[in-house]
Design a protein with these regions (language model features):
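Short Lys/Arg-enriched alpha/beta "domain-start" segment
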Residues: 5-46
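Short acidic (Asp/Glu) patches
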Residues: 82-90
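Hydrophobic, aromatic-lined core segments that form the binding pocket/scaffold
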Residues: 174-401
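Active-site ExK catalytic segment of metal-dependent nucleases
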Residues: 74-82, 103-105
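Active-site beta-strand-loop-beta-strand hairpin of nuclease catalytic cores
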Residues: 65-76
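Internal, well-ordered alpha/beta segment that forms a basic, Gly-enriched binding/recognition surface
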Residues: 104-227
């Protein structure tokens, strides 16, 4: 088995790397727009099953099923950064790649570039991911890095933090949280470039309810079933699951996070609050009118003891939970949706002064190792400085070693 290819790109805060393994995950988990797909030469493409991920030698995915111009085709799929990688790796001479029926690449090939060919000399259909991605490639790379094993980085980060005085520790994580916030707002802005406000909110909510393993099928459903349609037709959650078969992951899911359970919650939400994106916009806008002013990140530390009380965060949270979402999504998942979805979207739309809310908002879902780092580095004391979303995000950004 050869080592996966690695490419470097320029991100918002410096270079980042992407491996072919990430591209394979994007393909295998369906983390891209799948409506009205076309191959690079213009043929209609429909993905019935992406194939079984092959981590051994040979093609990256086995036994995929697709439709090309409506005709069923079965075989293997190979994933590369560029179409030229097929020839560079010598696949056109390797019988192990003789059953490949689709070449998936990140970058679309130039019109003058010759197609990849199999061992029989037949041109392979090519599909380019880049223009179909739900997010900026950097966001995929960050999510992938944070979904891996963070334990090896834990001790190194704790050591770096404890080498600083407490005030500098907090300032360091505050600065990292600010960078994380700017990235989230930037990525939300990219989503708003492709979708209007209602659709962007709809896609964001369904993606968040899908967790890491089921973001792809949830986003596919969001594209296929607009919010208005879900509110009016009220399909059964089982019907929605069946609409994108062979794409759901149930490995390691707690019962509360099963796709049917989360879809049932969102359908209840859509039924009770079909206008929830407008409610969200008006509610968050009212916070700015209530007197919150944009503040520089370093000014926030002095607000820690009283921010939640002074800016009525309990009331704000309750309003979002009830006025916007009708109490349909309980627990930390809704809190995560506020921090990862609602607030960045509102900021990207132009609402100012939201970073303090985002930083001092209640903590949502987070890996245990992150909470352990916050505790061991004595960032919070349980009195004047409590655990909040901002401290969690600062640690997460620090773990990326950017």
């Amino acid at each position: 088995m050869t080592e996966p290819e690695v490419a470097e790109f320029q991100g918002l805060y410096g270079p980042y790397t992407v491996t072919e393994l990430l591209l394979q995950k994007i393909w295998g988990q369906g983390l891209f727009q799948q409506d009205d797909l076309r191959t690079c030469d213009g043929r209609e493409l429909e993905i019935l099953h992406p194939g079984e991920w092959n981590r051994l030698g040979g093609p990256d995915f086995r036994r995929a099923r697709i439709l090309l111009d409506g005709k069923p085709v079965s075989g293997d799929v190979e994933v590369h950064f560029r179409q030229a990688d097929w020839r560079r790796h010598g696949h056109e001479r390797d019988p192990a790649y003789g059953e490949v029926v689709l070449h998936v690449v990140l970058f679309p090939p130039a019109a003058s570039e010759p197609p990849a060919r199999d061992v029989r000399g037949e041109a392979l259909p090519c599909f380019a991911l880049l223009d179909r991605l739900h997010h900026d490639l950097e966001e995929y790379a960050m999510d992938d890095a944070l979904s891996g094993d963070l334990e090896p980085r834990r001790d190194r980060l704790i050591e770096r933090l404890l080498a600083l005085p407490l005030k500098e520790r907090r300032e360091r994580l505050l600065g990292q949280a600010w960078k994380r916030w700017e990235q989230k707002v930037y990525f939300a802005g990219l989503r708003l470039k492709g979708l209007d406000w209602d659709d962007a909110c709809h896609h964001t909510a369904m993606e968040c309810l899908g967790y890491r393993g089921n973001r792809g099928p949830m986003l596919a459903l969001a594209a296929r079933y607009p919010l208005e349609q879900l509110a009016e037709e009220r399909p059964r959650p089982e019907t929605l699951v069946a609409a994108v078969p062979d794409t759901w992951s149930r490995d390691g899911l707690r019962p509360a996070n099963h796709p049917v359970v989360r879809l049932r919650q969102y359908l209840r939400w859509a039924k009770k609050r079909p206008d929830w994106p407008e409610r969200l916009a008006s509610e968050i806008a009212s916070w700015a009118r209530s007197g919150a002013e944009p503040r520089r990140p370093e000014e926030l530390l002095s607000l820690a003891p009283t921010f939640r009380r002074d800016y009525e965060l309990p009331r704000c949270h309750q309003r979002l939970e009830e006025f916007v979402a009708a109490g349909s999504v309980p627990g930390s998942r809704f809190t995560t949706l506020v921090c990862d979805g609602f607030l960045p979207l509102a900021a990207a739309r132009g609402e100012g002064g939201l970073f303090p809310y985002w930083f001092y908002w209640y903590p949502g879902d987070a890996p245990d190792v992150v909470r352990e780092i916050i505790k061991t580095a004595e960032i919070t004391d349980g009195r004047s400085v409590s655990v909040s979303n901002g401290w969690i995000q600062g640690v997460l950004f620090s773990l990326l070693d950017r």
